[in-house]
Every structure is written in structure tokens, then in C-alpha cells.
Design a protein with these regions (language model features):
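Extracellular glycan-interacting surfaces
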Residues: 1-340
Length: 340
């Protein structure tokens, strides 16, 4: 398989040397990649006898993945995890009951902050153009599943984030009828639309997209793109009870976002390569550079105050100076023919 046949779907370097990436190849399948030399070489580290649909790294050694595991000539939905850089994977079979959940066409959203528990949303689009979503929660130490079937949201989910066992947020791409963000305070049993986010007040037409919520040191951030290609941030400092809008907006249809901590975040305008550093818990945006080299990037991850990585579908870039300068990283993927 040639590199032309693959495209990056995510990139998360965790140190200067070690990191994870995901690529998509034929038939929507994903491969999980790992590097030990700063992104120069990547190894395919998929779980054996599996079809990977979604990867979710936690740190330099550990990652979750969702996919289908081949068991007795059957394909069963499973959550995989590794704590040794993908050298070995363990798996838990999801207690699914419906045939559509066993498909490679299922839409998947994951959220985890450690290797002790993980949230999984499986979704499908119905003939009515509405969506059906089933929510799974796994606590690995007890190997106990909590299953919430057909949660009360009918729009397309763009991300799920839990800030503790009970409080969580689902971000949507939808019409402005109520809200693009739903909140639970009972571990996903019920969800309520957040109606007082300031960026959405007074708007009745068009489509908005809320990105997956980011939670860092009590700062809750929901990046939001409005229907008029205006990008902004919604912030909360009290677990989503009250909200503040960023004092900066960007006119763009494409962005990449990363927060290293509650004090340091970045946004790239992927239409023109402008880079903004966000400080003071979101209150101050500083334009640090504009570089056409990083136009079209969609993934962005800073692992400290100065060093970050970005990717578009085919290329990888890194910065060592807060996003002021960027360098293209020449890479190769070892044994990529194994994916055929």
C-alpha cells in the first residue's frame, strides 16, 4: 500500500520522541500508529485479529481503541487497551444487543482521562435523518458495564466529555432550535439542553457545531463554529452551570484546537495558517504567527507550553516555540503493507 492510499485522522505526540497517530485506509478502517523517534518512523500497532474504528491515547504508553474483534468467525464490538505502547492489547466485549452496533459503519465517540474507565457512544443515522445513540460506560477494575440505550438526543454527536462520574457534556452539530450542548448530572441517565450559552442566544436559524468539550483544571471549554463561519469559545468555570463567551472570534470554517492546561491553549485558523495562543484562562488571545505551511491542518496537540504537533490528511508539522515557527516532519510508516 502506498502512502497515497492513507490519510491521517489524528496525531498525538506525548513527548519529543513518543506518540500516537491514527490513519484511515480502505473501507473506512483505521490503523493505530506509534513512533519512538519523534515522528520520523511509525509502526502499525493494531490489536491482533481486529478492525479498529477509533483510537484514544491517554499518555506515552497507554491508549484505548474501539473496534470489532474477530471471535469464532464473528465480529464483536470491543474496547481495546494497551499500557505498553501497543505491543500488547487486552479487550472487553461490549454487551451490545442490536445488529447495527456490530457494523463498521457505526459512528463512535469515546472519552477517557485514564485507564480506569471509559465512555463509549455508538450512533447510527435513521431514515428520518435523526440519530439513535447508545451509551456505554466501562469501569475496568470491576469489569462492570453501565448501558444506557437510545439516549434522548436525536442529532449528530461531535463529541462527549465527562468531568467526573456524574457530570458530562455531549456536543452536537445541529439546528439552533435549542442548543448545541447537552449536559448530564446523573452519569448519562438523562440529558438536558444547555440553553443559556451566550453565543447561541437570539439565534434561530442555521446550523452550529460544538466541538468536543475540553476540561482542564476546572476550566471547561466548548469550541463552537457558527453557521456564518464564525468560530468562538464558550467557557465555564463552574462545571457548566454558567457560561462566558470568548472576547475573540475568528472568521473561518476550519480550525484546530488544543489546550495544554487551563492557562495555555492554541487555535489554528486552518484556512490561512494563523496561530493564536490563548492565555489567562481563555480571556486573552495572542496571534503568534501566520504560516501557509499549516493551512488545512485539523489535528493539533501541545504537550507542554512550547511544543506542539499538527497534521493535515497527509503531512505532519511541529513547533518548539509556542507556535511561532513550524517545521514539516518527513516520516515513513513501516510495514504499511500489513494493512491490506
Amino acid at each position: 500500500m502506498e502512502n497515497n492510499d492513507i490519510q491521517f485522522t489524528s496525531l498525538q505526540m506525548r513527548t519529543d520522541k513518543y506518540g500516537w497517530a491514527s490513519i484511515q485506509y480502505t473501507n473506512k478502517k483505521q490503523a493505530i500508529l506509534y513512533t519512538r523517534n519523534g515522528g520520523v518512523e511509525w509502526d502499525v500497532v493494531n490489536p491482533l485479529n481486529s478492525i479498529v474504528l477509533f483510537a484514544y491515547p491517554i499518555n506515552a504508553r497507554s491508549s484505548w481503541a474501539y473496534g470489532l474483534t474477530k471471535t469464532n468467525d464473528d465480529l464483536l464490538p470491543a474496547i481495546f487497551y494497551t499500557v505498553n505502547r501497543g505491543e500488547r492489547w487486552s479487550e472487553f466485549i461490549l454487551p451490545v444487543e442490536e445488529e447495527w452496533e456490530k457494523s463498521t459503519d457505526v459512528q463512535v465517540q469515546l472519552h477517557a482521562t485514564n485507564m480506569d474507565s471509559i465512555w463509549i457512544v455508538l450512533s447510527r443515522k435513521l431514515a428520518s435523518n435523526k440519530f439513535e445513540h447508545n451509551l456505554y460506560y466501562l469501569k475496568t477494575k470491576g469489569k462492570a458495564w453501565k448501558v444506557i440505550k437510545n439516549i434522548s438526543i436525536s442529532d449528530s454527536i461531535s463529541g462527549i466529555t465527562f468531568i467526573n462520574d456524574l457530570v458530562g457534556f455531549i456536543s452536537l452539530q445541529k439546528q439552533y432550535e435549542t442548543s448545541t450542548v447537552f449536559k448530564t448530572i446523573n452519569g448519562g441517565e438523562s440529558w438536558q439542553a444547555i440553553k443559556d450559552i451566550p453565543s447561541l442566544e437570539g439565534i434561530n436559524t442555521g446550523t452550529a457545531m460544538a466541538y468536543k468539550a475540553i476540561y482542564k483544571n476546572k476550566l471547561l471549554v466548548i469550541p463552537t463554529k457558527m453557521n456564518d463561519d464564525k468560530f468562538l469559545m464558550n467557557y465555564s468555570f463552574d462545571k457548566g452551570n454558567s457560561w462566558h463567551i470568548s472576547n475573540k472570534t475568528i472568521n473561518t470554517s476550519k480550525v484546530a484546537v488544543s489546550f495544554f492546561s487551563s492557562y495555555y491553549g492554541w487555535v489554528i485558523n486552518s484556512e490561512n495558517g494563523s496561530v493564536y495562543q490563548i492565555i489567562k484562562k481563555g480571556s486573552k488571545w495572542i496571534k503568534v504567527s501566520s504560516n501557509p505551511l499549516i493551512k488545512n491542518v485539523f489535528c493539533l496537540h501541545f504537550f507542554n507550553r512550547r511544543k506542539g504537533w499538527a497534521c493535515n490528511k497527509k503531512e505532519i508539522f511541529n513547533t518548539k516555540d509556542r507556535g511561532i515557527t513550524w517545521k514539516k516532519v518527513v516520516y515513513k510508516i513501516n510495514n504499511i503493507d500489513k494493512l491490506v
